[in-house]
Curated annotation (Swiss-Prot):
It catalyses: L-kynurenine + H2O = anthranilate + L-alanine + H(+); 3-hydroxy-L-kynurenine + H2O = 3-hydroxyanthranilate + L-alanine + H(+). Its cofactor is pyridoxal 5'-phosphate. GO terms for cellular component: cytoplasm. The lineage of its organism: Bacteria, Thermotogati, Deinococcota, Deinococci, Deinococcales. This is Kynureninase. It comes from the Bacteria.
Amino acid sequence: MTTLLPALDLAQLDALDARDPLAHKRAEFDLPGDIIYLDGNSLGALPRRVPARLSQVATEEWGHHLIRSWTRNAEAAQDWMALPDRVAAKLAPLLGAGAHEVAVGDSTSVNTFKALAAALRLSGRRVILSDADNFPTDLYVAQGLARLLGDVEVRTAPGDEMTQHFTDDVGVVLLTEVDYRTGRRLDMRAITAAAHARGIVTVWDLAHSAGAFAVDLGGAGADFAIGCGYKFLNGGPGAPAFLYVAERHLDRAEVVLSGWMGHADPFEMARAYAPAPGARRFVVGTPQVLSLSALDAALDVFGDVDLGALREKSLSLTDTFIRLMEPLAEQYPLELVTPLAHAERGSQVSYRHPHAQQVMAQLIECGIVGDFRTPDILRFGFTPLYLSHGDVGRAVAGIAAVLDELEGPA
């Protein structure tokens, strides 16, 4: 049986939690008491305020007021019609964006298509460059757009060599700020500057960034960005995604999926499309009221959160996990693939293990919920709003027990 000699004892973990300025946020989530949830980077936990909001929307707004709810109480910001704009206004500060630069709705994949198409038009070039190991949907969407347009080429390159492939024929670079497998965080500001120096338009995927730490799209000079609402933003399964368009591009970026909800006056029922002001023009169809309402309520959790403290806790949690895992990495075939440098780390920690799928299945069975990514990645997500350092210690103890049971020390 392995003897775990942690770098931090339980008293130290308790002391870290006692000083945690975000400790009170845990009570705002409905978390099962029999698990340690390290998978908020796949699906965020349920904020307690969401069920009541959904019940209100379903029984009162839909059930009682019916179609009147589309415009009812607009002066009090309670109408459905402007719900995407209200959600965008709550989300924008987490992205370092203005509310008018953010559109909320559709899925991440659909928004990626919109962003890539608009970015290509702006660039006047025909090559999309992406990380060879980018999240598959980003690559699939780029490939589909290339097939549709016919004269567009999709190129890929290793992530750590990306800027070396910024050639004069590249029009758009599509990158994910935090790698979904390793948790490695890219330097958005530096890469964007390098892209702009070569006349390249940037599209950033923030799926593993938004809600995990403060994103600064404006400060980084990003052109476009997309992301989902169901991971660190806790908007629930299938939550609407978002699309960011830098203000300098709003009047020039072409809306290739032009729908009536992106029209300047939808109920004019005009025969020709006229774009709405700001990023709202990128909203395509009828707002998904139920899922938008869930995301709207979930974002209220961030209302009193200092984003600097959020990042500090994220790094403290992941530092603690890495230190506590060191004895296990010495005894078992565990390879840390997440960077140690804070500037290069998101809010997850990943290890390679030859039997990662089996190990993760057993961990989940024991109540330690992370996830597996092919071919050999154990992935653990750390959501600062509802995880504690004590959770980290208990998780590592559970991981040690599972590894002992499955294979014994290497």
